[in-house]
A protein has these predicted regions:
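Bacterial N-terminal signal peptides
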Residues: 7-17
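Short, solvent-exposed linear motifs at loop/edge-of-secondary-structure regions
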Residues: 9, 63-65, 183
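Asp-box/BNR beta-propeller blade signature and adjacent active/binding-site loops
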Residues: 42, 87, 94-105, 118-123, ...
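Sec/Tat signal peptide C-region and signal peptidase I cleavage site
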Residues: 18-22
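Disordered, low-complexity tails and leader-like regions
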Residues: 23-24, 358
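Exposed, polar/acidic Ser/Thr-rich sequence context and nearby capping/turn residues
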Residues: 24-164
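Bacterial N-terminal signal peptides that target proteins for export
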Residues: 1-7
């Protein structure tokens, strides 16, 4: 009985010495973390957000404390800045609470900040060193907020979440290109990583516009990358300017046996202000300037050099189809016999969108195009199932009010 009583006294004493971190009167806080990585090469990376809600005017924050004890390597971090967010939680950078240039297990930002009645937003940003490892994680928690009403420990809405480290491969304005979009990533036979994308030189918009297909390459598992360079560029073909010779939507597949890399893209010639998916932006038949064209570039040396552009429209597109184009994204290789399978899309004779696949059993020397799935769909991805069939996951536009996914399994007969 004495031991139990003594234990109770010690426990009561210990807890009486700890500061109370339940919500201070009239103030409570939430911690939120997004499910996306912090990127090497970016000036700001959102690693944690705080919503501090005051029930009335007159309260203020004195300090905010952040713990990084679960972070794999603190020296991956170059600096951290705490910002005051916008009224709706926008990640604004107009007002900085403070910056820490030396990583540590615990950071305390001491500054008096008057709280308005209602929600007050804060977000912690980190800038990563160029040497930060892609295998590492950042583990951050706002462990304490000191206010004029007392101490608060924010409620964590995503407990246990860690932030992965990534690499900002292409950023808006990099190399003079306005926007990079439509990425496709694959691994070459020598282990190199290859990233393909639209290089949208003038603006964000789709075709018709000055767009080339670009490439960045990594030979160290994605830790560093080469600068973007175009591999599919029509220039001023046919005497028309580059903004009437746009190439977009890369689709890529690597033959694991030969190492050949095939990249397809859709090319529009002329038709300024039009889009291949709308109206007469593309037309039936094969005529350049009327029908959007399917182009192919091939590399035999792991993406170092590329063939001249090949126009394969007549080889693949049915004449009555309005459009035939890459899905885009990645193809797959069937495990049983090495068949190459590439998801593709298009518009049928009535102009309605469709999805299907094309396949090659001779390492890309020739390709067989499947029939449209029958679903009103477009962009799609393929995966091989255990029985060797191919499941096609498609963006469906059957219900115009709500975009949905549609799934169809194609048997070996279709391949």
């Amino acid at each position: 009985m004495r031991l139990k009583y003594l234990a109770f006294l010690i426990t009561a004493f210990l807890f009486s010495e700890l500061p109370t971190l339940s919500a201070a009167r009239g103030i409570h806080a939430l911690q939120l973390q997004r499910a996306y990585p912090a990127l090497i090469g970016r000036e700001t990376n959102n690693i944690v957000e705080l919503k501090v809600t005051a029930e009335e005017e007159g309260h203020a924050i004195k300090s905010l404390q952040f713990d990084f004890k679960g972070t794999d390597e603190l020296h991956d971090i170059g600096s951290m800045t705490l910002f005051l967010g916008g009224p709706e939680g926008q990640l604004t950078t107009e007002w900085s609470v403070g910056t820490a240039n030396t990583p540590a297990d615990r950071l305390i930002f001491s500054r008096r900040i008057t709280l308005k009645k209602g929600d007050n937003w804060f977000w912690l940003s980190c800038k990563l060193k160029s040497t930060a490892s892609l295998l590492h994680h950042i583990d951050v928690e706002c462990s304490q907020i000191e206010t004029t009403a007392g101490l608060i420990k924010p409620e964590d809405k995503m407990p246990g979440r860690k932030i992965r480290i990534g690499y900002a491969l292409c950023q808006q304005g990099q190399g003079g290109t306005h926007t990079y979009r439509i990425p496709a990533v694959t691994r070459a036979k020598d282990g190199s990583l290859l990233a393909f994308y639209d290089m949208r030189h003038n603006r964000t918009k789709d075709l018709q516009e000055d767009i080339d297909i670009g490439l960045s390459k990594s030979t160290d598992g994605g830790q560093t990358w080469s600068e973007p360079r175009p591999i599919m560029d029509r220039g001023e073909w046919g005497g028309l300017p580059q903004d009437q010779n746009g190439i977009s939507d890369p689709g890529v597949i690597v033959d694991p046996k030969t190492g050949k890399i095939f990249v397809w893209a859709v090319w529009m010639y002329g038709k300024p202000g039009k889009h291949q998916w709308n109206g007469d932006g593309s037309e039936a038949g094969y005529e350049i300037g009327k029908a959007a064209q399917m182009l192919l570039a091939v590399s035999k040396d792991h993406g170092e050099t590329w063939s001249e552009l090949q126009n394969v429209t007549r080889d693949l597109k049915k004449e009555e189809w309005v459009l035939f184009a890459p899905a885009p994204q990645n193809g797959i290789t069937l495990s049983k016999d090495g068949t190459l399978v590439m998801p593709v899309q298009g518009r049928n004779a009535a102009g309605a969108p469709f999805s299907t696949i094309m396949s090659s059993k001779n390492h890309g020397r020739s390709w067989k195009v499947g029939n449209p799935t029958g679903e009103i769909s477009s962009e799609c991805q393929a995966v091989e199932l255990l029985d060797g069939s191919v499941m096609l996951n498609m963006r469906s536009s059957r219900d115009k009010a709500h975009m949905h996914r549609a799934v169809m399994v194609l048997s070996l007969i279709h391949i």
